[in-house]
From Swiss-Prot:
GO biological process: methylation
Reaction catalyzed: L-lysyl-[protein] + 3 S-adenosyl-L-methionine = N(6),N(6),N(6)-trimethyl-L-lysyl-[protein] + 3 S-adenosyl-L-homocysteine + 3 H(+)
Protein name: Ribosomal protein L11 methyltransferase
Record keywords: Cytoplasm, Methyltransferase, S-adenosyl-L-methionine, Transferase
Chain sites annotated for binding S-adenosyl-L-methionine: 162, 183, 205, 244
Protein task: Methylates ribosomal protein L11.
EC annotation from Swiss-Prot or TrEMBL: 2.1.1.-
GO function term, MF aspect, one: protein-lysine N-methyltransferase activity
Gene expressing this chain: prmA
Primary localization class, coarse: cytoplasm
Length: 307
């Protein structure tokens, strides 16, 4: 297969993309034309903040062509349909897309993840052979396995913040604790908590797809928990509240999350960069004294006990 690649201005990118799809290309993506250079301009921001850059000045439009398609003809047709300058048709290029078994290639990028010698995250395609270099085969087979495949919801165990929260649960979770996982994503933390001995476990997310993902993953792992949207969260306090989201939402949610922690209970927060730790901890200061429990690759896990 081949891709048609063309640089254009910000104002042209959307119209050209739509016209290319109408002309029959299989897919279109828009990238920063300066990607990988000093002029690259990241477009992102945490929830509650506006990205510093709203759009790239120079865009690279990449269109996947169907077999046998004439790229020049498709491009000219799209430019005309979008009412753009015909001169835009100059300067395009083609690049080959190698044939590949994309399912197998994707699976090869996700192997078993050891959180500790005891706790492992295992994709379904490694279900019968969770071998990882550095540990004896019998140690791997005796570990607690959480079966989880990458999907729409965040949380596969590979990100430092997920790893930090899992490590806390593995090391510190009180037996039988009532636990709230707020911002559950894939449900990985709630599922791990149940397998590690938590009692009643409630998983909450604002995204219905994440809630369904948690339900599905809990069924695969044969654990019982409740998964729901925030409005359905039952009343009451929890011995453990864990939230692996981002610093701005954590600050906004501080009164609610702190209020859900029972006296003597634990609050575990991640999704926080080292430079954000003091600010997030300060947001919880009226209710708990937070401290850094552990750091990993520039991210921290904050922990506090409610008096």
């Amino acid at each position: 297969m081949r891709e048609l690649v063309l640089n254009c201005r910000e104002a042209q990118a959307d119209a050209l993309s739509d016209a290319l799809l109408e002309a029959g290309v299989l897919s279109v993506s828009v990238e920063d034309a300066d990607l990988g250079t000093e002029a690259e301009r990241p477009l992102f921001g945490e929830p509650g903040t506006e990205p510093q850059v709203q759009a790239w000045e120079r865009n690279c439009v990449v269109a996947l062509l169907p077999g046998g398609a004439d790229p020049a003809q498709i491009l000219e047709q799209a430019i005309a349909a979008a009412g753009l300058d015909p001169a835009l048709a100059h300067g395009w290029s083609l690049r080959e897309v190698p044939d590949a078994d994309w399912v197998r290639l994707t699976q090869s990028q996700f192997g078993p993840i050891p959180i500790s010698e005891r706790l492992w995250i295992v994709p379904s395609w490694h279900r019968d052979d969770p071998a990882v270099p550095g540990l004896a085969p019998d140690a791997a087979r005796d570990a607690i396995h959480i079966e989880l495949d990458p999907g729409l919801a965040f949380g596969t165990g590979s990100h430092p913040t997920t790893h930090l929260c899992l490590a806390w649960l593995e090391a510190e979770l009180p037996a039988g604790a009532r636990l709230l996982d707020y911002g559950c994503g894939s449900g990985i933390l709630a599922i791990a908590a149940r397998k590690l001995g938590a009692g009643e476990t409630v998983a909450v997310d604002i995204d219905p797809q994440a809630v369904q993902s948690t339900v599905d993953n809990a069924e695969v792992n044969q654990v019982r928990l409740q998964a729901m949207l925030p409005d359905a969260l039952p009343a009451g306090e929890f011995q453990v509240v864990v939230a692996n989201i981002l610093s701005n939402p954590l600050k906004v949610l501080a009164p609610m999350l702190a209020g859900r922690v029972a006296p003597g209970g634990h609050l575990v927060l991640s999704g926080v960069l080292e430079r954000q730790a003091d600010e997030v901890a300060a947001a919880y200061a009226p209710w708990l004294t937070m401290s850094v429990w552990r750091e990993r690759d520039g991210w921290v896990c904050l922990h506090g006990v409610k008096a």
